[in-house]
Amino acid sequence: EVDAGSCNGCEIEIGGLTSPVYDSERFGIHFVASPRHADLLLVTGPVTRNMEIPLLKTYEATPHPKLVVAVGDCAQTCGVFRGGYAVVGSVDQVIPVDVFVPGCPPEPAAILRGILAALDRLPRR
């Protein structure tokens, strides 16, 4: 998960995915410490000037095939941060996005649906 400049509301909801209620691991979803071990990047917030290059490097470090899920209104439209001096733009203005999950913040169930929709795009093994 990459916080590109969010208020952390989406991160709180992402944390709920590992709770017994949503149990994202039952779908084979595991949060990893390195993009080199990831199939998918969750990105939150508008992309700030300080996070533009780190986001690009994280995307480049993720092996192919790679997926990106932009979580929250700010990731999609910059939300309340639109026009801010420190904001570069939405996530899709910096890296390709496969699925957008709208909401401010979106509920864990919506985030889980977005992740599963993105994973459906991966070739079957």
Q: Model features per residue range: what roles?
A:
Residues E1-R125:
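Iron-sulfur-associated redox domains of electron-transfer enzymes in respiratory
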